[in-house]
Structures are given as C-alpha cells and as structure tokens.
A protein has these predicted regions:
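Short-chain dehydrogenase/reductase
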Residues: 8, 74, 78, 108-116, ...
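Conserved beta-loop-beta element that borders a ligand/cofactor-binding pocket
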Residues: 100, 117-140
Length: 255
C-alpha cells in the first residue's frame, strides 16, 4: 500500500486495532485524536475534532486513504462525516472507507438511522468509497451485560438474537480493504453464530460468577419486529471465527 492512511476514531475499540494492524503491515499511519498524544509507536498522531471541524483539514492533507472508525451520537455523527468528506475532497483523498453496522437499513433505532445517513453521505461524496458493515462486537455486548448485571434483574429482549464478532477480525478486514481500491459496499462481516440474546446473557453470568434473574422484555413497535425478524443479523456472512465464549475467557479467565 502506497501513501499515508488516516484513521479516525483511532483510540476506540476498532480504531486502535486497525492502527496496530496497519503499522504491522508497514503502512504510514496518521491517527486522529481529540487530544495530543506522543509518538514512538510508528504512528503520526494528529489532533482534530470531527464535530467542530477543528484540525481536520490538516489531518487529511497529503493522505491517500481515510479509514473512518469514529462514532459520535445522533445527528453529530452525520455532521462529522460531512465534515470529513468535505475536507477529504478538498485534499484529493483517493479512497474513503467507512465502517458501519449490519442492519442499519432494517432496524429503525436512532443510532442506526444516523449510521445509514452517514453511509449516504459517503456514497454521495464524489470520492472513491467503501462501506463495510459488521455485526456487534463482543466488547459492546460485554459492556451491555456489565451494565445489566448491576441492575436488580437482568433484562433480556424477548425473541432477540445476536451474532457477535471479534473486533480483531473486523479490524483485519478493514486493514485489507484499506489496501485495496474503492469497492462500494463490501461483503458484510458477521460473527460465527447467530445466538439467542438470553443464551449469551446466561453464558456471561456463568463466566462472571454472578447470579441474576433474567427478565424477558418485549421490545415494542417496529424496532421489536425488526429485531425479532433478525434485521440485525447476517447469517449468510458468518465469516468470523472468534466465539463469545473465547471473549468471556479472555475477560474473566478461568472463573
């Protein structure tokens, strides 16, 4: 891969793995952070804020590929992508790779709607583009379960299924795509198995050595129907290999 790659969201769960893998491939990596960071890790750290636009023009200057792993909440997410696209266009960026989520076009929750709007901005940017959708990371599911375990009862969305994937596997695919040309919508990346939410919650509680009453909760309306219909899943793209049990073992050891 020739030229510099800018990674946004470089300190996040996915972004830091992408940065690490690109550096290991010998790629010149520029990483965007809202706070100043020291180098020494083979990375050129730059300060910028996608929401305000501060520092973004400088961040994209001289860059061939932008990998957007950043996430903000709601409308700010869309505004951030618009800012990135505008500055990347001015700088002559060759390829913009945007990481999204499986089901953003099927599950009508606000966060997913914002992601879908971001995809549209990328598609209409005039830049060469790739969008990669992935299912939920093990890390996200663990954070949700950590929060649920602090409640008197553990809520379980009735009928919901999850296809969690290892973030390292998604990062590896992102790093590959960054070295290729614009691909439009790339094949999705899903975890190895589609599993009931309840089954994953039970596995978490066993691994954590916790006891909680699991409380079935019916998710109402169109969101509930979309989840029960598997709108958040991509069973035909179950290409991940790392299991949720392996993530639990890494987190809790032999507990």
């Amino acid at each position: 891969m020739a030229g510099t790659v800018l990674v946004t969201g470089a300190t996040g769960t996915l972004g830091r793995e992408v940065v690490r893998l690109l550096v290991a491939r010998g790629v010149a990596v520029r990483a965007l952070s809202r706070r100043a960071r020291s180098g020494g890790d083979g990375v050129e750290w730059v300060v910028g804020d996608l929401v305000t636009g501060a520092g973004i023009a400088g961040a994209v200057a001289g860059v061939e590929v932008v990998v957007d792993c950043a996430t903000t909440v709601g409308r700010k997410d869309v505004a951030a992508v618009r800012t990135l696209v505008a500055e990347a266009g001015k700088a002559g960026v060759r390829h913009l790779l945007y990481v999204s989520i499986v089901g953003v076009d099927r599950v009508p929750i606000p966060y997913y709607r914002a992601k879908l709007a971001c995809e549209r901005v990328v598609r209409e940017s005039g830049l060469g583009w790739t969008v990669l959708r992935a299912t939920q990371f093990h890390d996200l599911l663990l954070r949700i379960f950590d929060a649920s375990a602090r409640l008197p009862v553990f809520p379980v969305p009735g009928g919901a299924r999850i296809q969690p994937v290892d973030v390292g596997e998604v990062a590896a695919r992102v790093a590959e795509l960054a070295g290729e040309g614009p691909a439009g919508y790339a094949p999705e990346v899903g975890g190895p198995r589609v599993r009931p939410y309840r089954e994953l919650a039970e596995a978490y509680l066993r691994a954590a050595g916790r006891r909680r009453v699991l409380l079935p909760v019916r998710v109402p309306g169109t969101v509930g129907r979309a989840l029960r219909a598997g709108g958040n899943l991509t069973p035909e793209r179950a290409v991940g290999r790392g299991t949720f049990e392996e993530a639990l073992a890494k987190r809790f050891g032999g507990h």
